[in-house]
Amino acid sequence: MEQNISSQILLSLIQEGLHVRALAVRLGTNHSTVLRRLQELVEENAVDFRTEGKNKVYYVKKTIEGRNRVIMAEYCRLSQILKRYPYLRGPVKTLLSHSEVPLVLIFGSHAKGTATGRSDIDVFLEKGEKTLKQELEKKYPRLSVKIGDFDPASPLVREMMKGHVIVKGVERYYDATGFFSETAA
């Protein structure tokens, strides 16, 4: 549970800097728990804050520790999705076995946690082949596979970046988005 809260905090702070109350509301937990986890993450050099008025606005620090904690948080998010939607285990295992695909994302309702029994499973494959797409969609009829380059300037990719689960290629994802590069905003 402790790791889960820290992971959720990091994944929220990747999107934008937030203060403690906003994080607590977003995560549906109490203020003191969020504050304790934030203090631990600050001590680990993974998170930092800036003061705006009377509030401390926390953000992910672009350090090796911050990068490592975010990578662990992404794997934790994948585990949470597999726990919530056990029928994703088969497709995820199949997707992981394709070494020629450097980046695999689940996006849409499954990534956001709003999937129903009839929801399709939206998957993005970077540099996949059409034959792979057809093979996957034949084996798992609920899969809706998108293939292409991971270009953060693309409207589809920008939409995926708002709500996704990284199945494969966490480092590739953050290298492509430039989040941990020195020139990233």
Regions found by a protein language model. Name each.
Residues 120-122:
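Acidic Asp/Glu-based divalent-cation binding sites
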Residues 1-100, 111-116, 126-185:
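Catalytic core of pol beta-like nucleotidyltransferases
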Residues 101-107:
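Short acidic amphipathic segments
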